[in-house]
C-alpha cells in the first residue's frame, strides 16, 4: 500500500517486532513504539532494510500523556495513520492471592489503558484514512486461571474494548479486531517457563519440552505466525472484517 502508515506498539521484541518487520512489506512507513530505544533501533534497521521508512518513538504508553504524543509525532512525520496495532503490554504473571494493587494497576495501565488511549488519540486520523485497528489480547481471556489471574482478566477486557471500538467504527469507517495468541515462543514465554518449571519440579529445559503436551498442542507458535495474522487484519482483504476475535493458539482452547 503506497503512502500508508502503520503504528506498531511493543515493537522492540517478540510479536511486536515480528509484526513491524512483516508490515514493512505492505506499508510505506512504520511508527515503532516501545520503551527500549536500543531494541527499537534494531527493529527499525530491519524495517528500513525492507524499503519502508521507520520512525522510532521510545515511550511508556502506561503514562497518560504518551498516547497523544505518539500520534502527534506520527502525523508530523507522515501526515496520516492507516493502521494501529496495539501489541504492547506485559502483565505480571502472579497468583491471584499474591498480586498487589500496584501490580494490577501497572498491568492495566499499559495493556488496557495504553491501547485505549492510543486508539482514541489516533481515531480522527484513522477515520480520515478509513483505517484499521488491531488489539492484541491472548487466549487466556477464554480461560482465566488463579496462578496468573491478571493476564486472563486484562486480556478479556481487551476483547471487550475492541468490540466497543468496532461498534463505533462501523459508523466511522474504522475496522477494529482483536487477536488471541496462545503459547508463542518469545522472550516473555521463556521468562514464564523459568517461573513455571520449579513449580512443577522440572528444569527449565524439561518444562520447555513438556509445556506443549500440558497445553494440548503440538508445538509453540512463532512470532512470525502471529505477525502474518496481524498483517492480514490491516490489509485490503480484511476490509469487511470488524468486531471479530481471532484466536491463533495451535488448538490449545478446545471449546466451541
Tell me what each language-model feature is:
Residues 78, 219-248, 253-254:
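C-terminal substrate-recognition "lid" of short-chain dehydrogenase/reductases
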Residues 95-96, 103-108, 211:
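Substrate-binding pocket helix/loop in short-chain dehydrogenase/reductase
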Residues 132-171, 183-184:
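Catalytic loop of short-chain dehydrogenase/reductase
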Residues 27-42:
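Conserved glycine-rich Rossmann-like NAD(P)H-binding loop of the short-chain dehydrogenase/reductase
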Residues 12-13:
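Conserved glycine-rich cofactor-binding loop
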Residues 85, 170, 175, 241-243:
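Short, small/polar-rich loop/turn modules that mediate ligand/substrate recognition or access, typified
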Residues 124, 167-168, 239:
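Alpha-helical segment proximal to the catalytic Tyr-Lys
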